[in-house]
């Protein structure tokens, strides 16, 4: 086991790593990438077949398959190192990628001709060995290489396969009869892949590519104050903390009896980063919005957060009430941290009211509309909000509500989609077993309605002697009715008007004729 070196000293160790181009790579060891006791690491078992998140402790064992394996040998090694499970000692033995590739090549001579698979029969009669024979070799403690080589030699169809099919067959047998473990450093990408592979429902179906849009569209940056509501075991809170790196404030609201931020511990954050996270019950916002007394609420429970004395207490003794074991696919633990004084209800209210928040992130399995309205008063104007859901209908409800009430601009709903590809010589193709879609995102910017000033209009009315004058204060409907009445009256009295006009003309003619007679006389 190597001793820990100072931060400014690098210990270089060259490891031959044979890939498709037969190039050698150099692994540089520094104190930042060396596995130490107390670190959280991810065990990648058989190239993604299974993931397990553990805390490294001297003398502790991890369940891999049906065996309890001692993990002392990984302390002092660099991250992304590979280990092989020893069948005899139940320990992890260091193995390089070159040794893995050489073992694959030395098992059997691969077929280099232009063979194809047209004559293969899918009747399971090509293998001469029975399952009893293979189990007998296992019980005798036969090496995995010997077992695989024996299986290949007793296969009648192996020599007729193409070289690609032979490599695929050998990799499948190596994965079945031997166990290779790679130690991965916990990051947002690696933790998301591990929990997505384990049970995607616990993290609401989030993939690592979803966080690129969540953090960017939510305007997550350093020196900002963010309000997050999630039901993903702390994965979203941890991603925001990783982006902000201890600069800013994260208000993590939870729904229910207590917070669930167990994944935050697995990131391996230092105390400065963890002290920026403030968990609180979402009921606080509802009480504030109603104007009720906040002192009536029970004290806010805190978990997933380190206080200043947590690391010292962990080194001395781990209290039973602060540790909750979770047995899922092996031995894994969730650490619940002591309650902090600065996560009291009064302090949370002060953080919400003093300056508000500039980003609102909602990732939950519940309906997002009520949660959004509860948190909306504390999002500053021009602040960014982003909501994730596995289904588009809840986001449509939020979009329509905000648009109708003119509460947000630049709203858009987008679908998260990604397709992973295998890139190998003459074997490049999309991965057939992955999910294409990973939910939907609604994002936008909060706006405040402008104050509408009341305007007074003055109407001047002129009085005329016309009998059919229209009152300007009447409604449009009454004007239409009166116009129709006037038109009807005009059309019905057209004949009487013409007769009256003729009578007046006759009178004028008779009067003019009388005047002429008087003049002549």
UniProtKB/Swiss-Prot annotation:
Residues 308-334, 510-521 have a biased composition (Basic and acidic residues). InterPro entries: TRM6 (IPR017423). Pfam families: Gcd10p (PF04189). It is found in: Nucleus. One of its GO terms (cellular component) is tRNA (m1A) methyltransferase complex. Residues 12-24, 452-476, 487-502 have a biased composition (Low complexity). One of its GO terms (biological process) is tRNA methylation. Keywords: Nucleus, tRNA processing. Residues 1-24, 305-336, 452-521 are annotated as: Disordered. Transmembrane segments: none annotated. The keyword Lyase does not apply. Its main location: nucleus. Substrate-binding subunit of tRNA (adenine-N(1)-)-methyltransferase, which catalyzes the formation of N(1)-methyladenine at position 58 (m1A58) in initiator methionyl-tRNA. Heterotetramer; composed of two copies of trmt6 and two copies of trmt61a. Belongs to the TRM6/GCD10 family. This is tRNA (adenine(58)-N(1))-methyltransferase non-catalytic subunit trm6. It comes from Dictyostelium discoideum (Social amoeba).
């Amino acid at each position: 086991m190597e001793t820990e070196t100072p931060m400014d000293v690098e210990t270089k160790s060259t490891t031959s790593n044979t890939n498709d181009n037969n190039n050698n790579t150099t692994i540089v060891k520094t104190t930042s990438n060396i596995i130490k006791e107390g670190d959280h690491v991810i065990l990648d078992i058989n190239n993604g077949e299974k993931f397990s998140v553990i805390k490294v402790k001297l003398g502790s064992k991890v369940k891999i398959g049906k065996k309890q394996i001692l993990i002392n040998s990984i302390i002092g090694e660099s991250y992304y190192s590979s280990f092989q499970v020893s069948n005899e000692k139940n320990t992890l033995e260091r193995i390089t990628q070159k040794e893995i590739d050489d073992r694959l090549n030395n098992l059997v001579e691969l077929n280099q001709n232009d063979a194809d698979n047209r004559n293969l029969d899918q009747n399971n009669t090509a293998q001469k060995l029975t399952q009893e024979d293979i189990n007998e070799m296992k019980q005798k403690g036969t090496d995995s290489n010997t077992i695989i080589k024996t299986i290949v030699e007793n296969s009648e169809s192996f020599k007729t396969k193409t070289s690609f099919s032979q490599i695929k067959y050998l990799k499948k047998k190596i994965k079945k009869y031997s166990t290779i473990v790679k130690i991965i450093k916990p990051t947002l990408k690696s933790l998301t892949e591990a929990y997505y592979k384990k049970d995607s429902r616990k993290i609401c179906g989030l993939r690592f590519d979803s966080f690129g849009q969540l953090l960017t569209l939510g305007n997550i940056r350093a020196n900002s104050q963010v309000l997050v509501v999630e039901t993903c075991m702390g994965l979203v809170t941890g991603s925001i903390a990783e982006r902000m790196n201890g600069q800013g404030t994260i208000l993590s609201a939870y729904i229910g009896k207590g917070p669930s931020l167990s994944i935050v511990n697995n990131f391996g954050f230092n105390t400065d980063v963890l002290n920026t996270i403030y968990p609180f019950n979402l009921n606080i916002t509802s009480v504030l919005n109603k104007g009720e007394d906040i002192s009536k609420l029970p004290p806010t429970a805190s978990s997933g957060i380190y206080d200043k004395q947590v690391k010292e207490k962990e080194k001395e003794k781990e209290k039973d009430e602060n540790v909750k074991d979770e047995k899922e696919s092996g031995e894994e633990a969730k650490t619940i941290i002591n309650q902090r004084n600065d996560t009291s209800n009064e302090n949370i209210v002060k953080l919400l009211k003093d300056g508000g928040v500039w980003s609102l992130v909602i990732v939950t399995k519940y309906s997002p509309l009520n949660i959004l309205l509860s948190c909306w008063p504390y999002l500053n104007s021009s602040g960014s909000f982003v909501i994730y859901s596995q289904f588009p209908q809840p986001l449509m409800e939020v979009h329509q509500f905000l648009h109708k009430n003119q509460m947000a601009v630049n709203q858009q709903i987008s679908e998260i989609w990604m397709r992973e590809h295998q890139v190998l010589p003459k074997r490049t193709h999309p991965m057939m077993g992955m999910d294409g879609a990973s939910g939907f995102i609604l994002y936008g910017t909060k706006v405040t309605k402008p104050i509408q000033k009341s305007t007074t209009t003055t109407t001047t009315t002129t009085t005329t002697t016309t009998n059919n004058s229209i009152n300007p204060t009447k409604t449009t409907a009454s004007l239409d009715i009166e116009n129709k009445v006037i038109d009807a009256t005009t059309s019905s009295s057209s004949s009487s008007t013409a007769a009256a006009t003729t009578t007046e003309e006759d009178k004028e003619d008779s009067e003019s004729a009388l005047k002429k007679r008087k003049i002549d006389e």
